[in-house]
């Protein structure tokens, strides 16, 4: 399974590529992106 690269929309950390986390620009708000 291909991982989601940086800045990709995501639902959980496990979707993101290694070293990236699924988080929003504003805490606990949508949308959430894979980011460092």
From Swiss-Prot:
GO molecular function: calcium channel regulator activity; ion channel inhibitor activity; toxin activity
One Gene Ontology cellular component annotation held by this UniProt entry: extracellular region
Domain notes: The presence of a 'disulfide through disulfide knot' structurally defines this protein as a knottin.
Keywords, comma-separated and alphabetical: Calcium channel impairing toxin, Disulfide bond, Ion channel impairing toxin, Knottin, Neurotoxin, Secreted, Toxin, Voltage-gated calcium channel impairing toxin
Cysteine pairings via disulfide bonds: 3-17, 10-22, 16-34
Transmembrane portions of the chain: none
Lineage of the species this protein comes from: Eukaryota, Metazoa, Ecdysozoa, Arthropoda, Chelicerata
Tissue expression profile of the protein: Expressed by the venom gland.
Similarity-based family: Belongs to the neurotoxin 10 (Hwtx-1) family. 53 (PNTx27C4) subfamily.
Compartment(s) where it occurs, according to its Swiss-Prot or TrEMBL record: Secreted
One Pfam entry name: Toxin_12
Protein name as annotated: U17-ctenitoxin-Pn1a
Role: Neurotoxin. Causes spastic paralysis and death in mice. Moderate inhibitor of L-type calcium channels (Cav1/CACNA1).
């Amino acid at each position: 399974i291909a991982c989601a690269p940086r800045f990709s929309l995501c639902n959980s950390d496990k979707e993101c590529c290694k070293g990236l986390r699924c988080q929003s620009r504003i805490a606990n708000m949508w949308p959430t992106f894979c980011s460092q």
